[in-house]
UniProtKB/Swiss-Prot annotation:
Residues 319-328 have a biased composition (Pro residues). GO terms for biological process: neuron projection morphogenesis; positive regulation of axon extension; positive regulation of dendritic spine morphogenesis; postsynaptic actin cytoskeleton organization; regulation of actin filament polymerization. Residues 388-447 form the SH3 domain. Residues 2-133 form the ADF-H domain. This is Drebrin-like protein A. SMART domains: ADF, SH3. It comes from Xenopus laevis (African clawed frog). It is a peripheral membrane protein. Residues 345-365 have a biased composition (Acidic residues). Residues 141-160, 184-368 are annotated as: Disordered. PROSITE patterns: ADF_H, SH3. Its main location: cytoplasm. Residues 184-242 have a biased composition (Basic and acidic residues).
């Protein structure tokens, strides 16, 4: 972009004319830019010569100075143009202002010497005056020239030849080579530092991208694993709910058949079967021998044990029923003690349990009434018996029998005479008096 001289044209032109005019005291004018723009403004003027001008130059700016000096040889006025670029100016600004030098030279016309300066050593007044003296073209002064007539006889003309000093020449050349090499080394060092910095920056950028990619892959993998776990838990929960809602008789796997296959796989020489024989009521035989005119026995009131407070597990959802074993329950639940010794021995042999440690029915001291199912509203006569309940358990959930080999019960019902025939299935009496199998995880044993 070109330099703008029209914005402050009047001030610029006035200072320039004052320097050209020998009648004015102003012998130098200094120009610079307005901020970072290309508009030229008048920075300062003065009448103190080069010494005063040098003090006004700033190391952080690009400036143009026009100064009037006297030729040391002829005493005539000479004009010097100084293109000043401070050491603190940025490289981009230097490149932009380099194109303005020719424009400023056309504006500040009449300069005998032009100096491009960057440091204070380039604008020392002595060095500038030496350049002005060399530019005059003659080493004489018109005002100091003496008349030839007054001169005395001239002596022989002496030679101006000077012998070359080899050492000084070597030192001068060596110094120049040294500084040139130093500048070259410094330039190479800066270039190497830039390459190293760029390489380190690229390496850090690659590591950052690789780390971010690994972290993203890890997060994605954890998310997929978590999603799979959630889906598996949801499917398992749905299967559990579906199995709980389907009755035992309608399930795809029949637990009785599974247990039957398991029981068949056992060796035949195992313990005595836990299946009891058919029960026969001795009370019927006894009543058949008695005459019809015998008075009916007095009714006996049943004394029921108050139910214990129910014990519920942490979750009220009934667990799945385990595989039941195949078993045949007895046909009757009444065991009467006979007064006859022979009959008593016979009944004890019939009701002996298949297992050695547990009896299905133990001896009782009184008889129970077998006429409880009479449809008429007549009083029910029962034979007073003493029943031993054996191992008891309280129902935690309700269970409906799938067939006649199982028993049904409601929560808090008491189940007595329990036999542990399998790990998942037990056998006992329900409150209704039925004997059969039931799932072990539906009840809680009572101490």
């Amino acid at each position: 972009m070109s330099v703008n001289l029209s914005k402050n044209g009047a001030a610029l032109q006035g200072a320039y004319k004052d320097v050209l005019d020998e009648k004015t005291k102003t012998d130098w004018a200094l120009y610079t830019y307005e901020g970072n723009s290309n508009d030229i403004r008048l920075a300062e003027t003065g009448d103190g010569g080069l010494e005063e001008l040098v003090e006004e130059l700033s190391s952080g700016k690009v400036m143009y100075a026009f100064c009037r000096v006297k030729d040391p040889n002829s005493g005539l006025p000479k004009f010097v143009l100084v293109n000043w670029t401070g050491e603190g100016v940025k490289d981009a600004r230097k490149g932009a202002c380099a194109n303005h030098v020719s424009t400023m030279a056309n504006f500040l016309k009449g300069a005998h010497v032009t100096i491009n300066a960057r440091a204070e050593e380039d604008v020392e007044p002595e060095s500038i005056m030496e350049k002005v003296a060399k530019a005059s073209g003659a080493n004489y002064n018109f005002h100091k020239e003496s008349k030839r007539g007054n001169e005395g006889p001239q002596g022989p003309v002496g030679s101006v030849y000077q012998k070359t000093n080899a050492m000084s020449e070597i030192k001068r050349v060596g110094k120049e080579n040294f500084w040139a090499k130093a500048e070259k080394d410094e330039e190479e060092r800066r270039m190497e530092e830039n390459r190293r910095a760029n390489s380190e920056k690229d390496r850090l950028e690659r590591e950052r991208k690789e780390r971010e990619q690994r972290e993203a892959e890890t997060r994605e993998q954890r998310f997929r694993e978590r999603a799979k776990e959630i889906d598996a838990q949801r499917k398992e929960q749905e299967e559990t709910e579906k199995q709980q809602t389907v009755p035992a008789s309608q399930r795809s796997v029949n637990p009785r058949e599974t247990f039957l296959q398991k029981e068949r796989s056992l060796p035949e020489s195992g313990p005595v079967s836990a299946q009891p024989g058919r029960l026969r009521s001795p009370f019927l035989q006894k009543s058949a021998c008695q005459p019809e005119s015998s008075p009916p026995p007095s009714p006996v009131h049943r004394v029921q044990e108050p139910p214990s407070p129910p014990v519920y597990p942490a979750h009220q959802t009934p667990p799945e029923s385990p595989v039941p074993p195949v078993s045949h329950p007895p046909e009757s639940t009444v065991h009467v003690k006979e007064q006859c010794t022979a009959s008593q021995q016979e009944e004890e042999n019939i009701y002996q349990d298949a297992t050695e440690d547990q009896n299905i029915y133990e001896d009782t001291t009184e008889n129970q009434n077998i006429y409880e199912d009479t449809p008429q509203e007549e009083p029910v006569y029962e034979i007073e018996v003493e029943e031993e309940k054996g191992v008891c358990a309280r129902a935690l959930y309700d269970y409906q029998a799938a067939d006649d080999t199982e028993i049904s019960f409601d929560p808090d019902d008491l189940i007595t005479q329990i036999q542990f025939i399998d790990e998942g299935w037990w056998r006992g009496f329900s409150p209704a008096g039925h004997f059969g199998m039931f799932p072990a995880n539906y009840v809680e044993l009572l101490e």
